[in-house]
Amino acid sequence: GMFGGDVHLRAYADLQRAGLSPNLGRCGLDQWTRDLAGIEFDLVAVATRSEASAQKSAANFKEWTGHEPKAYHGETPWEDVLRDFPDLDVMAVSTPDHLHTPVVLAALENGTHVITEKPMCLNMTEDDLIIEAANAKGLVVGVDMHKRYDPDHMRIRDDVTNKIGDPVYGLAVLEEPLEVSTSTFKWVEDSDPFSYVGPHWTDLFWHYYHSKPAALTAVGQKKRLVRDGIDAYDAVQVRVDYANGMSVHYHNNWILPADFEGPVNQGHEITGTDGKVESDQQYRGF
């Protein structure tokens, strides 16, 4: 899929070719780096639901790197991977949202660290199980939160938040095209727009202020997708009131029309006691 095949697999191809550069702690950028890399990396397996998808991913990886991982497929292919590679160091999870938890828990039970796409899971019960399992075995569960590394966002965190005073309220928007919910993903009835992309923004505001939520309200609408026989939320609006007195509204949908001016619409703003900052990621405006 989009995350597994385009985002994760290409990142691991860079690691396969170049390793992790010593001292820099980052992926090498050329074919000579691996000879000097402090950590070597081997993608030993790819696992998907269908055989065709697994074979395609393995073939693409071989084309990019010259190394072909073993391909697995089925309803629970991660179990086969862990059986064949019991000493696996890291399991990367980019399944549909509602299928993260069984893979993560199986990896932790095996003693394997985890990298997972957001959201880590979809409810607090699963969240508690994952945290308990990771802590019990001293393992890391890393969740992909790349919004915090956008240059504009780092500037807000390190500089602008110190200039606008105490935060009063904020707004964060990430809206996806209708194609995502009607064609790209087949599992939207098992998740919702906020669970899918909202964690990027909740993580970002945590990264800015390190203030915990004190209260939360959420509403959602089902009007557009039901016309296509899809029983899923079109949009979700979440208000989070934080311990520091700040209130933030998170707006997410996956029903933008095909002729919208950008592939997605995203941005956020913060109003403080002494100033205001606006950041529009659609145009990279600040």
Regions from the language model: what does each represent?
Residues 110-112, 137-139, 245-247:
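A short helix->loop->beta-strand "cap" motif at the edges of active sites that frequently abuts
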